[in-house]
A protein has these predicted regions:
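Extended amphipathic alpha-helical segments enriched in small hydrophobics
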Residues: 143-144, 252-254, 445-494
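Long, intrinsically disordered, low-complexity segments
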Residues: 102-105, 177, 186-187, 192-194, ...
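Sec-dependent bacterial lipoprotein signal peptides
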Residues: 1-20
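Conserved, well-structured interaction surfaces
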Residues: 42-48, 55, 79-156, 174-210, ...
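Membrane-proximal, proline-rich intrinsically disordered regions
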Residues: 22-68, 103, 119, 356-377, ...
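Flexible, polar/acidic helix-loop-strand segments at domain edges
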Residues: 370-453
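Short, surface-exposed recognition loops and adjoining beta-strand edges that mediate ligand/DNA contacts
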Residues: 63-76, 155-170, 206-247, 261-345, ...
Length: 593
């Protein structure tokens, strides 16, 4: 096993990086038979070591983990999240596992950090030191990111009641290393995370930009002898897409909110005020609420914006993203079958019910005006932007989709493996200017955002409500109320009556914030983890909507049970991989697994 892990350190050839404009960011590493000492002589070889850490970024694509929650089911019987939600989740059958890749990523980072100062980055000594600083900053940021994802998937209480994280490893590991080490406490892991963030922030620019004057050079680098040309050579716009200070701050916001949440707060050493402050640092850099993208809620559908993205550039809504590529993969998987799709991800009635009516009231509130006989009328505009409901239009020809019982291949449960199981199809993430007809089979550009500013706004709202109350601001200029108001207004909900009512109670505002998060970040891999950190119920049955006609031809809407959720209480925390426990006796498993 030690030999296998040691080999990770030397697989530095030919990188297939999942980065924006990856070909411009890294040169392929030299053949690995040169030996690791070659790092000192060849900068591209050294870059290959760090590049191998980049290839292990867990947020490179959407996992559609919503299928494991109350928000969606899949019509694919082999879907791992569907099987997990049905009771097959074990420590050796774990779709949520991040141990292997994130631990390997940290190993690459540690090796890189141990050699970075000796690498011949440039002939010019000032440029060489600048390169070393930037590369170290990236590596520290990457190690912090990997720690966050490891804690999200594997932290938990052991049988003795201690909240544990993962082993904190900050030095290179080799054939003679002792891999049989215990897990650190969760709080120790968070301290290591924050330390890496601080180290990264001391070295990285907020954004990679080309500067024009010495006034823009940080004092630390000016003392090294940096000038405008050297700064642009090392920290210029061509490095967009790599780890920068704004990304590090965003992960600090994510991790702090995670640690302050009910599932971890008792032994994390992090509180909601810290989480609010860290989120605000990110948001203040874009002007706070005034920097919110008015079209951010439909980032995936802004076709002209996506098509025009150049290498390394980001839309206003997106802080960090994956590479832009031309394909029709999401549409092939999720368009309704009448449009040559597989209809894989089916939003649930539970999710549809989360959308308020146009006046902002929940559908369960009599003041909402919700009509169960016409359930999709007068609703939050985000509903039909994110979900294909009965009668919705999809694709280049605005084809009407009928999900009624017996209405054709798009009808509920008509064709096993291609028709919807809930009466709904996914619309969010999909471009509507794609034609899957085999005679056409058109493709369009897509990308996966790794961090959206909307997430950070929602992080702030959640933490600020808990720390300061609905309208409290702490040391900042905006409140949880202000953020949620802006998010709802940009989606078209401009009646603030219900929002104002929620602002009278921290509990009511918490409920509203969580619901807005559920809607805004839907199908982007959040809810599975949010439910767990909140210690919210996990076993709500996934429901659908059967639509039939009465004798007069009027539609009759009948909610139906679709799929059970079989989770045990210990499943608020994910397991340590069973294979690791077999090899290392010092590792303790989380309780219940």
């Amino acid at each position: 096993m030690k030999t296998r892990k040691y080999k990770y350190l030397f697989l530095v050839a030919a990188l297939g990086l999942t980065l924006t404009s990856c070909d411009d960011l890294f040169e392929p590493a030299k053949e690995n038979n040169l030996g690791i000492d070659y790092m000192d002589k060849d900068a591209s070889y050294a870059e290959g070591v760090l590049g191998n850490a980049y290839t292990r970024i867990p947020c490179g694509s959407f996992p559609f983990s919503e299928v494991g929650t109350d928000d969606a089911v899949s019509n694919d019987a082999t879907n791992n999240w569907r099987k997990l939600a049905g009771g097959t989740w074990t420590s050796n059958n774990n779709p949520t596992e991040r141990w292997r890749d994130c631990r390997a990523g940290i190993m690459y980072v540690n090796l890189f950090l141990s050699r970075v100062d000796g690498v011949h980055w440039a002939d010019d000594d000032v440029a060489r030191r600048l390169y070393a600083c930037r590369e170290k900053g990236e590596a520290f940021g990457m190690r912090a990111m990997f720690m966050y994802y490891l804690l999200q998937a594997h932290a938990g209480y052991d049988e003795s009641g201690q909240l544990l994280g993962v082993p904190v490893v900050t030095t290179p590991e080799g054939a003679s290393s002792n891999f049989n080490v215990p897990r650190n406490t969760f709080e120790e892991c968070m301290k290591a995370f924050y330390a890496d963030c601080d180290s990264a922030l001391a070295l990285l620019p907020d954004k990679y930009v080309d500067i024009t004057s010495d006034a823009s050079i940080p004092a630390y680098y000016k003392k090294m002898g940096a000038d405008v040309d050297r700064m642009n050579r090392v920290f210029g716009v061509k490095f967009n897409g790599r780890m920068d200070a704004s990304i590090v701050k965003a992960f600090r916001s994510k991790a702090a909110l995670f640690a302050a949440s009910p599932a971890f707060s008792a032994a994390s050493g992090t509180n909601y005020q810290q989480a609010a402050d860290y989120a605000a640092q990110v948001l203040d850099a874009i002007g706070g609420i005034s920097g919110m993208d008015p079209n951010g809620w439909t980032w995936y559908a802004n076709g002209s914006e996506i098509d025009a993205l150049s290498n390394g550039a980001n839309p206003k809504e997106v802080m960090w993203r994956g590479e832009k590529s031309q394909n029709n993969d999401w549409e092939t998987d999720n368009y309704p079958p009448s449009l040559y799709g597989k209809g894989r991800i089916n939003p649930t009635q539970n999710f549809v019910d989360a959308f308020p009516t146009a006046n902002g009231y929940p559908v369960t509130d009599p003041r909402s005006g919700y009509d169960a006989r016409n359930p999709y009328a007068n609703r939050d505009p985000r509903l039909t932007a994110y979900v294909v409901v009965d009668g919705g239009q999809v694709g280049v020809n605005n084809t009407k989709i009928n999900t009624e019982v017996g209405s054709g291949k798009d009808g509920i449960n008509t064709e096993v493996g291609s028709s919807t199981r809930t009466g709904y199809y996914l619309r969010k993430l999909l471009r509507q200017d794609i034609n899957l007809d085999p005679k056409v089979n058109s493709k369009q550009y897509h990308y996966t955002p790794r961090i959206r500013y909307t997430e950070i706004f929602l992080n702030y709202a959640e933490a600020a409500n808990e720390a300061f109350g609905p309208k409290g601001t702490g040391t900042h200029s905006y409140s949880a109320y202000d953020v949620i108001k802006a998010i709802r207004h940009r989606a078209g909900i401009t009646d603030d009556s219900y929002l104002d009512e929620c602002a009278q109670s921290k509990d009511k505002m918490r409920e509203l914030i969580r619901n807005e998060r559920r809607i805004e970040l839907s199908f982007e891999g959040f809810r599975f983890w949010d439910l767990r950190r909140w210690k919210a119920p996990l076993t709500a049955e996934a429901k659908g909507m059967n639509i039939t006609a009465d004798k007069d031809g009027n539609k009759v809407y009948t909610p139906v049970d679709v799929e059970d959720r079989d989770y045990k209480d210990y499943m608020y925390y994910g397991p340590i991989p069973y294979s690791e426990l077999l090899k290392f006796t010092e590792l303790k498993q989380n309780k219940g697994w």
